Amino acid sequence: MKVKSLKRSSKKEIASLFDRWNKSLKSGDPDQVVKNYAKNSILLATLSNKPRLTVAEKKSYFKSFLINKPVGKINYRKIEVGYDTAFDAGIYTFTFARTGAVVKARYTFTYRFDGIKWFITSHHSSRMPEDK
């Protein structure tokens, strides 16, 4: 029986996963964004009251979200790494190129390594209450 070796990541590698996700937003293609999420992941999005569980639900959310051409920037973060898992939580700001709107939000990404690639297992984002 072969024993799976566990991957211990670095904070730098986990930080790069936000960059990968943000780059997929810039593509404007919901399919590219959704490829970052694990099959059984949950998206609790900033601009939606509905938990997004399926690929179709996530794709639907990002289809409307991407219309305004969002670009995210990390303002503050805390990253913790384990074996095959990690989380990145903090505050980010989205600037929407189409409208000029700026939205500051709290976020949490949890990740799992599947032996080949890191995937988002949960993503929570909520607008900062003081900025409403």
Where are these regions (language model features)?
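Short beta-strand edge/turn micro-motifs at domain boundaries
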Residues: 104-132
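Hydrophobic/aromatic beta-strand elements that line small-molecule binding cavities or substrate pockets
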Residues: 58, 62, 74-80, 92-94, ...
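A short, structured loop/turn motif at beta-sheet edges
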Residues: 79-86, 99, 112-117
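Short helix-adjacent coil turns
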Residues: 21, 25-29
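A solvent-exposed, acidic/Ser-Thr-rich amphipathic alpha-helical stretch
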Residues: 11-12, 17, 30-82, 99
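Short, well-ordered beta-strand segments in beta-rich or mixed alpha/beta enzyme
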Residues: 42-46, 85-96, 110
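Residue-level preference for beta-strand/loop junctions
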Residues: 70, 84-86, 103-105
